[in-house]
Amino acid sequence: MEYSYPFSTDWSTEEIVDVVQFFEGIEQAHEKGIKREVMMAKYRRFKEIVPSQAEEKTIFREFEEASGYISYPVVKQTKEAADGTIIKIVPKKNR
């Protein structure tokens, strides 16, 4: 699947790379799972670049529209899980 990652023109090249790596972690959590510690490190770096909650929500929405992957459940599970846990989003079955 080809799509563009959301980013700001105000970010440096390094920041853009780090945000793309964060979203690659979101993709991995949806597809095959990612270690909690790895995802948390990616999220912490993302929050250094995007400290505003409102901007985070906007970027998450843009990423979801482009990719179909929802970021919030991954972040929530990452924050709540213990170290050593694999973060994996299981799709909900239609009723």
Curated annotation (Swiss-Prot):
Pfam families: UPF0223
Protein name: UPF0223 protein Bsph_1378
InterPro entries linked to this entry: BH2638-like_sf (IPR023324), UPF0223 (IPR007920)
Similarity remark: Belongs to the UPF0223 family.
Species whose genome carries this gene: Lysinibacillus sphaericus (strain C3-41)
